[in-house]
């Protein structure tokens, strides 16, 4: 069975055969990473949809669950999710509607609002996380522990390089 990446790889090989200065391996690796990320997101979104939630709501629940008291201010949630405060309010509204969080006044300052994960929210996470973890184990079982360590090291190295390029104002050219 051909990989879903085969058509892209064939196109790149064709381009490389016509242009001797074509940076085949660099473009191939970049496209492989992009293709894999797309497939990972597609798979994850299908799983989350089957569980009745989307990525944004799920990440908000995980963010709350990861806090010491399972509580966070809306502005902190906004920052953690990389979204606007308006969008964080919409997210909190949906989580509250589903009974997964409660809005509570701060013990120290009544003007300060906290989003608190409810028992129903904890219960939902206890339900949805095991199938997700199982799926991840299935995916990553294709690699040995050594290969996973190597991939992590290489990925971190490339991410550091991207961060440095961004700091230096270097923009990746459009993919050929």
Swiss-Prot record:
GO biological process: DNA-templated transcription; negative regulation of DNA-templated transcription; regulation of DNA-templated transcription; response to antibiotic; response to stress
Domain of life the protein comes from: Bacteria
GO cellular component, one term: cytosol
Induction comment from the UniProt entry of this chain: Autoregulated.
Entry GO MF terms: DNA binding; DNA-binding transcription factor activity
Entry-linked PROSITE patterns: HTH_MARR_1, HTH_MARR_2
Keywords: DNA-binding, Repressor, Transcription, Transcription regulation
SUPFAM superfamilies documented for this protein: Winged helix' DNA-binding domain (SSF46785)
Record bears the keyword rRNA-binding: no
HTH marR-type domain residues: 26-160
Cystine connections: none
Entry function: Negative regulator of the multidrug operon emrAB.
Stored PANTHER family: TRANSCRIPTIONAL REGULATOR, MARR, TRANSCRIPTIONAL REPRESSOR OF EMRAB OPERON
Protein name per Swiss-Prot or TrEMBL: Transcriptional repressor MprA
């Amino acid at each position: 069975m051909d990989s879903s990446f085969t058509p892209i790889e064939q196109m790149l090989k064709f381009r490389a055969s016509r242009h001797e200065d074509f940076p085949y391996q660099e473009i191939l690796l970049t496209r492989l990473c992009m293709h894999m990320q797309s497939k990972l997101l597609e798979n994850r979104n299908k799983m989350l949809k089957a569980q009745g939630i989307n990525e944004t709501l799920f990440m908000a629940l995980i963010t709350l669950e990861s806090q010491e008291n399972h509580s966070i201010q809306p502005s902190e949630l906004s920052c953690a999710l990389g979204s606007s405060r308006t969008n964080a309010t919409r997210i909190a509204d949906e989580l509250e509607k589903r009974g997964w969080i409660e809005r509570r006044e701060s013990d120290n300052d009544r003007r300060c609002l906290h989003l608190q994960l409810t028992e129903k929210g904890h219960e939902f996470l206890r339900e949805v996380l095991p199938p997700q973890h199982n799926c991840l184990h299935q995916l990553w079982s294709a690699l040995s522990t050594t290969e996973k360590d190597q991939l992590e090291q290489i990925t971190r190295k490339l991410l550091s390089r991207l961060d440095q390029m961004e700091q230096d104002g270097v923009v990746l050219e459009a993919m050929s």
